């Protein structure tokens, strides 16, 4: 088999997605889809939720170890791979040590409630076994918006989960969805999200503006007039309000979807003024 064929043999889909912060990591598919699968805006979790048996994971790891023997970083694929039991994650990590002994940093996607279902002891164990970072879709700090979009967690639960990661020393990266509240809740979304983030210490805040994906519930609500989608300019103005009210420290802020064509990024708090200036400049264009 060629290298390409070997890679193809270990992934279900042709394209795999890992967060930009994990670029360069080897990617091991441990699950497909999302165990929650109910957020009304989500087009990400297309597969039915499925956890690969350990035998399949071991087989894939053997191949991945052959293809990337020197890689020190591993990303576990699955829309919320951290929902796997601690015991199962530890079994996977045992196999990682066998087939990819150079790996010392493991990251994956997680929901806030996946973290809450684990005890402090389990979180500490996973950290000691190499789980160094989780990527979490926070989306909004506003409870009415989280509830309306069926996120399945409250802002208090998000806060609790991420504080527990901080106590354990597991890093976390969060995504926010500007525009998720629609025109009606735009201010609330901006201010409540800033309020939530100000109580946290994420490594990175990644804004991905709302996109209405065909066939999602939210898209259908918008078509029926129950959700007012904002223009890209309105969404950027909302993001500006959130940024203005953000007081997080040592955190990279980025948005790769500005006006559907630009990327802005900068460290907070030092580059906050530059980021606001960049937004003002883009909003002032004809
Ligand atoms: S938790 Fe994430 S992956 Fe799962 S349905 Fe919601 S947005 Fe999609």
Describe the role of every protein-language-model region:
Residues 26-28, 72-74, 104-108, 134-136, ...:
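Hydrophobic faces of well-ordered beta-strands that scaffold small-molecule active sites
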Residues 1-22, 198-286:
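Auxiliary Fe-S-binding modules of radical SAM enzymes
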Residues 34, 42, 57, 76, ...:
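Conserved, mostly hydrophobic/aromatic
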Residues 57, 89, 119, 158, ...:
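Aromatic/hydrophobic pocket-lining residues that form the small-molecule binding cavity
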Residues 13-56:
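Canonical Radical SAM [4Fe-4S] cluster-binding loop centered on the CxxxCxxC motif
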Residues 66-167, 247:
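Conserved SAM/AdoMet-binding glycine-rich loop
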Residues 113, 137, 141-145, 165-189, ...:
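Conserved strand-turn element in the central/C-terminal portion of the radical SAM core barrel
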Residues 121-122, 181-199:
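Catalytic cores of alpha/beta
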């Amino acid at each position: 088999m060629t290298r390409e064929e070997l890679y193809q043999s270990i992934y279900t889909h042709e394209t795999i997605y890992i967060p930009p912060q994990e670029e360069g990591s080897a990617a091991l598919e441990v699950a497909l889809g999302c165990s929650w699968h109910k957020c009304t805006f989500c087009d990400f979790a297309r597969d039915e939720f499925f956890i690969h048996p350990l035998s399949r994971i071991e087989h894939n790891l053997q191949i991945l170890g052959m293809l990337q023997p020197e890689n020190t970083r591993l990303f576990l694929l699955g829309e919320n791979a951290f929902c796997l039991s601690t015991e199962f994650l530890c079994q996977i990590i045992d196999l990682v040590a066998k087939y990819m002994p150079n790996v010392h940093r493991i990251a994956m996607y997680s929901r806030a409630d996946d973290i809450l279902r684990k005890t402090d002891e389990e979180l500490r164990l996973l950290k000691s076994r190499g789980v160094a970072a989780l990527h979490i879709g926070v989306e909004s700090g506003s409870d009415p918006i989280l509830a309306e979009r069926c996120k399945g967690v409250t802002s208090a639960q998000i806060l609790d989960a991420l504080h527990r990661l901080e106590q354990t020393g597991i890093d976390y990266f969060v995504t926010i969805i500007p525009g998720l509240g629609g025109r009606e809740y735009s201010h609330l979304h901006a201010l409540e999200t800033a309020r939530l983030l100000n109580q946290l210490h994420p490594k990175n805040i990644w804004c991905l503006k709302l996109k209405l994906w065909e066939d999602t519930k939210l898209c259908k609500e918008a078509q029926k007039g129950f959700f007012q989608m904002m223009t890209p300019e309105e969404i950027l103005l909302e993001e500006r309000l959130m940024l203005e009210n953000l007081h997080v420290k040592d955190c990279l802020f980025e948005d790769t979807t500005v006006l559907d064509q630009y990327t802005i990024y900068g460290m907070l708090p030092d580059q906050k003024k530059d980021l606001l200036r960049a937004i003002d400049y883009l909003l002032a264009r004809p």
